[in-house]
Each structure stands twice: as structure tokens, then as C-alpha cells.
Amino acid sequence: MAQLTPMMQQYVETKEQYKDCILFYRLGDFYEMFFEDALVASKELEITLTGKNCGQEERAPMCGIPYHAAEGYISKLIGKGYKVAICEQVEDPKLAKGIVKREVIRIVTPGTNLNTQTLDETRNNYLMGIIFTDEHCGISTVDITTGDYYVTEVENNRKILDEIYKYTPSEIVCNPEFFHCGLDVEDLKNRYQIAVSTFEDWYYDSEQSVKTLKEHFKVGSLDGLGLKDYSVGVNAAGAILKYLYNTQKNSLSHLTHITPYVTSRYMVIDSSSRRNLELTETLREKQKRGSLLWVLDKTKTAMGARMLRSFVEQPLITMDEISARYDAISELNDNVITREEIREYLNYIYDLERLMGKISYKSANPRDLIAFASSLSMLPHIKYLLSTCESALLKQIHEEMDALDDLQNLIDRSIAEEPPIGIKEGGIIKEGFHTEVDTLRKAKTEGKVWLAELEAKEKEQTGIKNLKVKYNRVFGYYLEVTNSYANLVPENWIRKQTLSNAERYTTPELKELEDKILNAEDRLFSLEYDLFAEIRDQIAEEVKRIQKTAKAVANIDAFASLAYVAERNQFIRPELNTNGTIDIKEGRHPVVEQMIPNDMFVSNDTYLDNAEKRISIITGPNMAGKSTYMRQTALIVLMAQVGSFVPASYANIGIVDRIFTRVGASDDLASGQSTFMVEMTEVANILRNATKNSLLILDEIGRGTSTFDGLSIAWAVIEHISNTSMLGAKTLFATHYHELTELEGKISGVNNYCIAVKEQGEDIVFLRKIIGGGADKSYGIQVAKLAGVPNSVLVRAREIVDQLSENDIAEKARHIVSAAEISNLTPETEGEVNTNKMYTTKVNATEVITTEVNTAKMNTTEMVSNQESVEQPRNFGQMSFFITEDTKQKKASSEFSEKLVQEINQFDLANMTPVEALLKLDKLQKKIRSHT
């Protein structure tokens, strides 16, 4: 086999060290990829695949991209889940002896992408490190574009997920044990597009982690960083820092502090609730428009947008912190002119955090510094406007905001007003800042003038009237004197060449000019680059001041946005309490009211407490507004704890520790779960993790299964929640099981509410108003009419409902099948009916007994013949859980049936739970089998 060429050998050796990356190998003005990397990159980037002689018998697959366009291509690969290793030329090819020296200068991963052009400026790009142990889990999260760095510890899988969903990192790096902690890691990768990889063994060594953190923060003990009680968290923080050093190959000087926190400081919102409440994006379109953040975010800066997003994603549970935010918003609304002036200045501030990150990474260009200085020029105005504020948070922002006028002055003096993007092309340094730059720049542009002046001066001094300053590539610049004036040549001139009719000379002054003119451009570009790098480094040394100021700007922007939205949307300042009462008057959905015209949104009251108003059972037809009402209540509570004003005429909010929602029903095809399985998984999570201080929003529990099972589950869930020794949480419970309305008065704390509906003949009008009492109709056919269901279907539905509304549901269902079979059907549906696949279903013996006891129509022989799993017509009506008086009074067709009815009559249904009812039915079934 032929030998590889020296260059290709260098490539192969480098690639061997970065097997999990696509290697961008710098060759002149291009980054080239070879072999397998070329095959992958050409496909993913849609670029031409070629070949290159590599010294072997076959040409190596090759593709390439221009170096100046690399960031866009890198971001594409990162977005597709790849890692990219950037291998640069680290010596001047002109000076290289042999193969140019190359090194990997950075590894780009989803969590370490520095390309601010492709990152969403309104959200952080987090990298998360997770160390899982049997007792605790350490979690550290960092955004290297802003310098944010956090650490915490949690106890169980659910809390790990809560932190993941809160930060939504682009990348997770973990220890191998994390893959065995019971979480669906593949789901994180596939559904949430989070890149997940493991640390190497040495990364999560605890001693190494402590050492890494101490060295980075230059401290002798981690206690001063607040990390004393975070042993596993320190492990995660150190591991993620080592990972960054290894991939970024940079000092990471902008990671100036680490923030430890306890998760109990914030309200817990699980992933389902975040999606269902549409906090930052809509459920279907995954867009910001239509979310709560869309309503609240009227920030002017990228920093403010990220800060406000963090407010929404991490509601507070401490009254003092929340009240402080209210005070800031109140003051900004009391001083509208001040607020709007601040917002106007904020409009001209660039992303200081990410600009600072680029400066620290030495990737900032001259235009970045101009944007930075332009932003700093706004700070004195904002600081002055804040100087008169009295609320605690606004005073704190004023104190923490540094005008940074020294840095602004440095940039204004040194950097040209309209510099190029490149840093090695000159034109960066402002005239008058550096004498040598001015001289070189003058030499580059005024060299001919200097030569003409020298020529005139020498002519005058020597009397050589035909003296000329000339140039050629061999001798450079020289003074040419004809032989007729040779006697006038000064002794200090140096002869360079003798011609037949002339002599050529040089002088020290001409040599100096020659040096300036010929080397001016190269020296100028090099000097300007050095000066720019020096200025950039000077700014980087002030990273702590800049980051502190950037956070102050972000906070005032977020509060000004909340104040502006509160005023524009007529939000009010809520009151807070610790007794658990939620009292909302004329509450409105903050998003829906913005989506409908002319103030048509109907407001509603809500009252929940820890005593007799714990659970509200809400009934009413679909489309009437049950889900909107429940979501609006949850959002008002959440907004109150975010520190925002709320859409209501009055609100007194008891602090809740968690908000859980079970809203909607859909199959989770990605993870192979059915509608009902998704529903029950979420219900199980709620019942296990909610506390008496939680707020539960439950919509249509049990609708994903059969009527009887669904009703039983819904009933049992309400019993569990209402029991103060088990849970006792405040709950809004929407249902179509109207039988559940009978729980009011039977279970403590349960109250009935419904959506008011106005009937107009066969039509209905949804009044959208919550009123006391339970609904007596579902208005399903009327809703179907509103949805545009064909009239023929509606007519047939009315016929069926009239039949099913009578007590003999099971018997009538048989006739419905027959009626359907003889109706006008399409050939396709006709075939389904003829094979009994449309209107029949398997039911078990318990369902058969339940149905037939209710109707008291089937004799003993029929019961016995149907006690095993059999084909039965599907019951299209809502099966009644309660045995009617009419059923009890009917006579059985046999002596055994009569005894059965007598026994049923003795049931104390009013005090019987669903589980007890099922046990009774099981006992009856055994009697029937025994009798046969």
C-alpha cells in the first residue's frame, strides 16, 4: 500500500485525536474535509464532493468551504447533531519549513456554539453537566456566550427533569450512571433535540473538579463561592468546566462567578404544564406568538428578553422577592415619562453580554467594539433617570449599573468610526491615536509626495539640475545622476550602480523613505492588529464590571417591559397571602384577550381555598370555554409569582409551590404511548408530586378509556385530591361526566360550576360565563353543527340520542346498529357494517353485568351466555354509574333475577365509593356464575 503524503499524514494523525468530530482542516483560504468526514459534510451541507491525491492508489474523498463562510456551515452541522473540530494553521506558510504546523484550536458542539448570528438572541444557549449518584444528582448549567454559570443538587429523577425543562439546554454532558437513572434519555435526544454525551472517567473525579474550580476562580477554598453544601454539584460544575477547557482551549475568563441555588426557591412547573400553559411557545406551531411570553415581552434589548424569559420560566415563591418586583413595576407606571425615556435609550443598546463573551474569546472584531461603545454611551442617561427611583430593586439596579465611561472613551479615541469587519486589513485605528500608525498610513498614501520633496531638496542642495529619484525591483529607490554632473555628487552618497552614461546612488534618508514606503502597508496592518488586540484585552480585563452592568440593563429592561404591558393591557397589582386563598375577580386570559377583537373577552371570577372551596368541578359543552377558564386561572397565579401584574379587576393570590396541568389528550407516538397512557402517566405524576400548596388544572380525566372506567378513575382522583390527609390541593376539574356533580355535598371541599349556555331553538349561544351548579346537557350535537358536520349526520345523531336517552340503552343500541346497516352508506362503510366492525366491540363480563343491571332487561340465561368476553354493540350513550329508581322497581323475568334486584336495592349508593361499587358488581358476577 502506498504511503500517505506528508500533509495527508498530518491530517490523519489529527483526525485520530478527534474521532467523534468532523475535522475542518485549514488549507489556505479553505477548510477541507477528507475521507468519511467529506462524505458526511458534502451530504449534510449540500456541497460538491471531489477528490484529492493523498499518496495512496485511490483519491481521497474531499470537500471544502471558504474559511470566511465557515461559521454558517458549522452552525448547520451543529444543528444536525454533529461536533466540529477546527484545525487552523498556526504558523505563516511563507516561513514554514516543510509542512505548515496545524492545531485544533476549538471544538464546536451544540452547547458551545459561539456564532451569535445563528443563535436566538432572546434565549440562552445552555450547556448542562449532570453527575448522577445513588443519593443526589449534581447539575451545573453554563452559557458560554453570556457567562451565566449555575449549580444545584436534586434528589430524584423528576427533579432532574424539572431542571432540564427549565433550562432547555442544547447539550447535556453526563456521567454513565445518568443513562441508568430511569429517565428516557432517548426521548431527550429525539423529542427535545438535546445532544447527550458522556464524560470520560477523569472528568467526574471529585478531587479534580475541586482543583479545576479553585484554579479557575483563583481561590483557596470553594466556601467563599457558596459551594460548601454542594458536594455533588461541585463535581458537576468542575466536570463541565473541564469539558469547556478541553473543547474551547481558551482561558474562559468571562466565567467570573458561579451561582449556587436551591430548587425550592422557585415554583416547580413540569414539562407538561409548561407546554399546556404555553409559557414561551405555542403547543402546536411552536412559535412565540400566542404564548404568555409573547404578551409580556416588550423588551428593547436581547439581554432584557433573556431576563424576562427567565422570570417566566422560574416563578418565585418568596413573598418579599415577588413584592419587590411589584414595587418596581408600580414605580415605573407611576412615572411613565421616566419609564418611556429609559425604554427609548434601551432601544440603542446592543447585546452587551454576548459582545463581552466575544471580547473575552478574542473573537470580537472592530465593529463589535464600535457597537459596544455605542451601547455604553446610553448608560449615563439611564443611570441618571434611575437616580430618582425609590423602590428597592430600581435603587439596586442604579447602584449596580456602571456607566463604563472609561471604556467608552478608550474605544472612541482608538477605533475608527467605520472600521472594517476584518482585523488584519488595516483601517481599524483612528487617526491621532498612535503616532507610528499615522506615519505608516501617511507613508502608504503619500510616498510619491515624499520622494518628490526629497528630489527637490537634493537638487537645491547639490545643484544637480537633472537629478531624478527612480525605482526598480532590484535596487529599490535610488538617485540617478548623469555623468555630466558626477563632480557635484556629495561624498556621503552611496553608489549602488554604474551605467554607461550615469551613476545611481542612495542616501540614509532615501533608505529610510524606501523602508517606510515599501513596507508601510505590511507594517501598518500588523501594527493596527496588535493595537486592536491590546485594546480588546484592556476591555476584557473589565469583564466583571461589564457583566454586572449588563445584568442591571437586562433587569431594568424586563421590569420596564412588565410595567408597559401592565399599563397597556390594564393589568392590576395582585395581593399576596400565605393562607392558600386564590381570589380572582373578573379574571381574563392574558393571551386570548389579545387574539380577539374589540374587548370581546368575557371575564370570570375564581375562588379557591384550603377549606370548603378546594375543588371546583366544571361542566359544560365543548367550545364553551372550560379549558380557557382553567388555563387563565393558572396563568394569573403564575404571572403573580413571576412578579408581573395580572389581568383582573382584583386578585389575592395564595403562594403555590407547584402548578400541574393535565389538559388535552393526544397519542405520544414518538415514545409509543397511547392517549390514555399519556393521560394516566401525567395524572400519576401529579398525584405523586403535588402538595397541599399546589394548584392542579385537570381537564377531562378519564376520557381516553371506556365511560365506566373513565368515570371511576375521575371519581377516585377527586376523592384522593380532596382528602387533606392524602393531598388536599386546590383544583379546577373540568369533565363531561355529569355524574361527578353529585359529589358536591358528599365530599368535603367539592363545588360545582358550569359554563352558562343560552338555547335558541336548536341552536346554542356560549355565554362564556362561569356560574354555580352543574350542567345538565353536553350540547354535543349543537357543537357538531357549529363545527360544520353535515346536516344528514346531525339528523341521524338526534334520532340516536332520542333513543339512547331512554333507560333501555343496551337494547336500543342493538337497534341502532340495525338502523345503520340499512341506511344510505357509501360502499366502503357498508362493508364495515356488514362485517360488524363499525358498531361492535369486545366488552368484558363486568361491563355486561353493569349494563344489564342498569336496564334489568336481560334474563339470567342471557347473562350467563354473555358473561365471557363477547361481541356486544358499542354503547354510544354515556353509561350511567347510578342505578335509577325505575331500574330498581322493574321485575325480573326469573326468580333469580328478582333476588338479584332485591339485593341491588339494598345498595347504599349515596355512601358508596366507585371501588366499593366495583367490588359489589364482582360479587354479583360470581353469584351469576355460581347459579349457572
Curated annotation (Swiss-Prot):
Organism superkingdom: Bacteria
Residues reported to bind ATP: 620-627
Pfam short name (any one): MutS_I
GO biological process: mismatch repair
CDD domains cross-referenced by the UniProt entry: ABC_MutS1 (cd03284)
PROSITE patterns: DNA_MISMATCH_REPAIR_2
Stored SUPFAM superfamilies: DNA repair protein MutS, domain I, DNA repair protein MutS, domain II, DNA repair protein MutS, domain III, P-loop containing nucleoside triphosphate hydrolases
GO cellular component, one term: cytosol
Keywords: ATP-binding, DNA damage, DNA repair, DNA-binding, Nucleotide-binding
One GO molecular-function entry: damaged DNA binding
Protein function: This protein is involved in the repair of mismatches in DNA. It is possible that it carries out the mismatch recognition step. This protein has a weak ATPase activity.
Similarity comment: family membership: Belongs to the DNA mismatch repair MutS family.
Protein name, entry field: DNA mismatch repair protein MutS
Organism: Lachnoclostridium phytofermentans (strain ATCC 700394 / DSM 18823 / ISDg) (Clostridium phytofermentans)
